[in-house]
Amino acid sequence: MEDFVRQCFNPMIVELAEKAMKEYGEDLKIETNKFAAICTHLEVCFMYSDFHFINEQGESIIVEPEDPNALLKHRFEIIEGRDRTMAWTVVNSICNTTGAEKPKFLPDLYDYKENRFIEIGVTRREVHIYYLEKANKIKSEKTHIHIFSFTGEEMATKADYTLDEESRARIKTRLFTIRQEMASRGLWDSFVSPREAKKQLKKDLKSQEQCAGSLTKVSRRTSPALRILEPMWMDSNRTATLRASFLKCPKK
């Protein structure tokens, strides 16, 4: 699973997922399913905000990356992917500026057009079940919830899907592709079922033991783009690189 994640997701997303797991004391070598889930959630959050801006009239517009309109305001503020301290700093700043009610839990995005925080969910289960779990946890009508599944289903607060149909279709297509690629590598069942995940982990550990005697040369290269952008990747151009380089899963 770890190899699959590194092949199929943008290196910057992988880096952010690694940092998130390290912050919470989780080992990605063991919790590979969580590693994949975090990367998937991050990518959906970035895709959700992709190309969406607010013009001078306060209207939401879609602008392609090649468009020279750099002065347009991003419609969405990305909160997910930041360390907790910085994330809460951003949330507090938004609340002070807009008058929005401070959420109890860290949300994923803020929508400047609708003036609301958004919680994004990506589930391997039924969307309505996951939606209810999110709603029960958040317990706030102020935070908008939008759930996507790997089967193309979605559910949102008051059936308000925020984005246009084409933007949502991009997200659904990407999730379906991830599912298909996992399935082609025999990883999907373990990703969905914790019991299957434990079996897969035992197989992986056994395989590692068998290979322990052989020397392996591992590349530890750091992406030049990541060196340049970090820690500035969340500035006004924070998603430019990500927009241009979402990686497709290579063929098996």
UniProtKB/Swiss-Prot annotation:
This protein's UniProt keywords: Decay of host mRNAs by virus, Eukaryotic host gene expression shutoff by virus, Host cytoplasm, Host gene expression shutoff by virus, Host mRNA suppression by virus, Host nucleus, Host-virus interaction
Active-site residues (renumbered): E80, D108
UniProt GO BP: viral RNA genome replication; viral translational frameshifting
One Gene Ontology term of the molecular function aspect: RNA binding
Subcellular location per the Swiss-Prot or TrEMBL entry: Host cytoplasm; Host nucleus
Gene3D superfamilies per UniProt: Influenza RNA-dependent RNA polymerase subunit PA, endonuclease domain (3.40.91.90)
Marked site positions, Important for efficient shutoff activity and nuclear localization: R195, K198, K199
Signal peptide: none
Residues under site feature: Important for efficient shutoff activity: K202, K203, K206
Described purpose of this protein according to its UniProt entry: Plays a major role in the shutoff of the host protein expression by cleaving mRNAs probably via an endonuclease activity. This host shutoff allows the virus to escape from the host antiviral response. Hijacks host RNA splicing machinery to selectively target host RNAs containing introns for destruction. This may explain the preferential degradation of RNAs that have undergone co- or post-transcriptional processing.
Record's comment describing the protein's domains: The probable endonuclease active site in the N-terminus and the basic amino acid cluster in the C-terminus are important for the shutoff activity. The C-terminus acts as a nuclear localization signal. The C-terminus is recruited to host protein complexes involved in nuclear Pol II RNA processing.
Family: Belongs to the influenza viruses PA-X family.
Name recorded for this polypeptide: Protein PA-X
Organism: Influenza A virus (strain A/Chile/1/1983 H1N1)
